[in-house]
Amino acid sequence: MLSMPRSSAHSIISLFNDESPEANEFRRLYSKLKNLYADEEMKNFLVTSAKMNEGKSTTAALLACTIARYRNTKTILVDCDLRRPRVHQLFGIPKEEGVADVLTGARKLDTCFKQTPIENLRLLTAGGVVTSPTELINSPRMHDLFSEIKFYFDTVIVDSPPVIPVTDALILSPEMDGALVVIKAGETHKEVARRAVDLMRNAGLNILGVIINNQKGVLPYYYDHKYYGYSYYNLEEKAK
């Protein structure tokens, strides 16, 4: 179970120090992912959820911080949730000059990267308000955007909209090497979570696992995606 606090500006960086429980558990999560998928070249990760308010943005932010520091590669966190963007709030930076502005041609991509206190981590925020987010994400320009991002960065973490309400996360699937699904314990019905996983599988997303987010502050557990099928097991069991 993973505790995802409601983060105010700058709190992601304050949470992410070597001694914090959050940093320790995300190091553990990253280590498990790295060991389990050592034979696969995983560079582009999508983080999503079944529905809203399950902690996906905080998860994506902490995972990006972890990979930037401990993988020691050029890492970028991209906010593709154009309806309810949150990455800029988590890091306390402006939302403007981001994904939407690049896709509409208002800005060049390399002028929109934003620095963070973590040396190897940059951000691409959601950008300005758009009237048709799905249409914009589904445009050919999105593929061009990710092609250019991958030229500049070694690891890409994408915070996408939830799967059930809109199709944006599924549209992004061709650009991703794998996906993590964040589920809120005690609130997300199993059938809703299973439906989200099925939609992602049908879209061709490689589901790396399910992160159970518990607001009560219990230390995290990471489950293989079979948790929402007929069986479940954590990574310690899978690694045996």
Language-model segments: what does each one mean?
Residues M1-K240:
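P-loop NTP-binding module
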